[in-house]
Swiss-Prot record:
Function: Catalyzes the formation of S-adenosylmethionine from methionine and ATP. The reaction comprises two steps that are both catalyzed by the same enzyme: formation of S-adenosylmethionine (AdoMet) and triphosphate, and subsequent hydrolysis of the triphosphate.
Stated name of the protein: S-adenosylmethionine synthase 3
Required cofactor names: Mn(2+); Mg(2+); Co(2+); K(+)
GO molecular function, one term: metal ion binding
Lineage: Eukaryota, Viridiplantae, Streptophyta, Embryophyta, Tracheophyta
Main localization of the protein described in the UniProt heading: cytoplasm
Compartmental location: Cytoplasm
Residues bound to L-methionine: 56, 99, 246, 277
Catalytic activity: L-methionine + ATP + H2O = S-adenosyl-L-methionine + phosphate + diphosphate
Keyword ATP-binding on entry: yes
Pathway where this protein functions: Amino-acid biosynthesis; S-adenosyl-L-methionine biosynthesis; S-adenosyl-L-methionine from L-methionine: step 1/1
Protein family membership: Belongs to the AdoMet synthase family.
Gene designation: SAM3
Keywords for this protein: ATP-binding, Cobalt, Cytoplasm, Magnesium, Metal-binding, Nucleotide-binding, One-carbon metabolism, Potassium, Transferase
Amino acid sequence: METFLFTSESVNEGHPDKLCDQISDAVLDACLEQDPDSKVACETCTKTNMVMVFGEITTKGNIDYEKIVRDTCRNIGFVSDDVGLDADNCKVLVNIEQQSPDIAQGVHGHLTKRPEEIGAGDQGHMFGYATDETPELMPLSHVLATKLGARLTEVRKDGTCPWLRPDGKTQVTIEYYNENGAMVPIRVHTVLISTQHDETVTNDKIAADLKEHVIRPVIPEKYLDEKTIFHLNPSGRFVIGGPHGDAGLTGRKIIIDTYGGWGAHGGGAFSGKDPTKVDRSGAYIVRQAAKSIVASGLARRCIVQVSYAIGVPEPLSVFVDTYGTGKIPDKEILKIVKESFDFRPGMIAIHLDLKRGGNGRFLKTAAYGHFGRDDADFTWEVVKPLKWEKPQD
């Protein structure tokens, strides 16, 4: 049996880039909660002792940007300079302007267009992917890397591993078998965890705790064997972390946010963007389409692409590829997809309820992946039943 290795990585919520994603989405939540028609393009950057939010926001809401920044940093665990940032004493800079009137008239006619008339907020192409290798219909390499990162945060916050600090990265290499286009995971080849820690803990204690409290609860035993390689804090020291260790920017972890390197990516980031931005809403609807194709038994693995022009509601193109795993020809699946899903941005926002912010709805998406999550707020993960006739043998 011929196999191959494939690797996906993740970073947890204390990574500086992910901190920025979460702040941008916390701002989006606040805007949509007060004004569902808010137009938001919020970027964040951070470095030692400083966080800056900047971009274009038009909202009727009264937004306290500084409070959102400090609350988000504090909730992640950035409560002192020692851990990489002090939420209560760092500098917070704000440089927000209104959305360009040129864009506003072209996309939503200064809020006068009906939902079906709303144009895409920009050009671009987005991809959705699904695979039957996990119950989430997501790639296993990505699922495990993401769950390891989430577990690192869990054992830090609940006190199981008090030596942990907020910043950390994970990476999982899996040995796969290609079964006529479908991906079948055989075993975990390598697990890599690099996590920020305090001054007192030894490397032996780090390795032992990570195996016992992080890896064992996350990775099913059937995938581990005596040949599995573990790299646990291989650099030997990771005390300085968060924005003190590295600068952070919104939109720098787009593969972690999506499919861990599987499928494809059009390049557009998600966080800090309202649903007229098709980088986000377009990617969400094609994930729902791809997931529904696999869940309905039409294919074992599938990618869907959609593309847009600024100011134009209808997509320019929709593409489906089932990697040879389709039960009927791809062109017939494409027809079903076009009949079942409305790709116009204003209609995506309605069908997926994307104008509803608050309660950390979009903040939740900004760490540990936008897809494959079991949470009612992730409306794009709801499978849409697709009607099709099984071909007669």
